[in-house]
Amino acid sequence: MNLKPLNDRVLVKRLESEEKTAGGLFIPDTAKEKPSRGEVVAAGPGKVAEDGKLIAMTVKKGDTVLFSKYAGTEIKLDGVEHLVMREDDILAIIE
């Protein structure tokens, strides 16, 4: 399925969380939190300002981003969990 976000919305695929801690301890699935970073799969054209001008998106397809824990709306595309969120919900681009 192909999904094209509108306006300032972004489609993000969550990246897998770490399997073990820095100290080498394995984290069981029941103790893992949903990861708060992901890869931008698609991005809309941007937000329309009050004066009618288009404000271009900062993020682009392929960017790895950090977002808040409760950001976006969860959807499944081809059996894979994704999030649709506004660009404002993205906290940072990881370089």
From Swiss-Prot:
Its main location: cytoplasm. GO terms for molecular function: ATP binding; metal ion binding; protein folding chaperone; protein-folding chaperone binding; unfolded protein binding. InterPro entries: Chaperonin_GroES, Chaperonin_GroES_sf, Chaprnonin_Cpn10_CS, GroES-like_sf. It is found in: Cytoplasm. It comes from Nitratidesulfovibrio vulgaris (strain DSM 19637 / Miyazaki F) (Desulfovibrio vulgaris). This is Co-chaperonin GroES. One of its GO terms (cellular component) is cytoplasm. The keyword Phosphoprotein does not apply. Belongs to the GroES chaperonin family. Keywords: Chaperone, Cytoplasm. Gene3D superfamilies: GroES chaperonin. Heptamer of 7 subunits arranged in a ring. Interacts with the chaperonin GroEL. Together with the chaperonin GroEL, plays an essential role in assisting protein folding. The GroEL-GroES system forms a nano-cage that allows encapsulation of the non-native substrate proteins and provides a physical environment optimized to promote and accelerate protein folding. GroES binds to the apical surface of the GroEL ring, thereby capping the opening of the GroEL channel. GO terms for biological process: chaperone cofactor-dependent protein refolding. It comes from the Bacteria.
